[in-house]
A protein has these predicted regions:
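Carbohydrate-active catalytic/glycan-binding domains of CAZyme proteins
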Residues: 1-107
């Protein structure tokens, strides 16, 4: 399961992962959390509120929003929609190349 944590109006908002053996839990947070968080070097602030989709070719993508102002340091609800690839690394951990602030190819 992915989830958003912290206050969406601030830079500490981000996306985390939790796993469980059953839909009702118990849930365990991923050791490598957060999956995405603010990265001002990439021009990204406060990624969150996400969905994961699988394309016809089997690739996973994460669709999320982030602050439109990449240097957000105050409450802001001006958001843009983003999409980035998700993949499992050689150890079976869910990873992404995101968050990004650049256009991505249409899946």
């Amino acid at each position: 399961m992915t989830y958003s944590a912290n206050d969406t109006g601030f830079e500490f908002y981000g996306i985390g992962i939790a796993t469980a053996p059953h839909p009702l839990g118990p849930w365990t947070k991923y050791d490598d959390n957060p999956l995405m968080t603010t990265d001002l070097s990439k021009g990204v602030s406060s990624p969150g509120h996400n969905s994961i989709v699988r394309t016809k070719d089997g690739k996973l993508w994460i669709v999320y929003h982030r602050h439109a102002d990449p240097d957000c340091r105050k409450p802001s609800f001006d958001r843009v929609v983003c999409i980035d690839r998700l993949f499992f690394d050689k150890n079976g951990k869910l990873k992404t190349d995101g968050p990004t602030s650049t256009p991505q190819p249409v899946p």
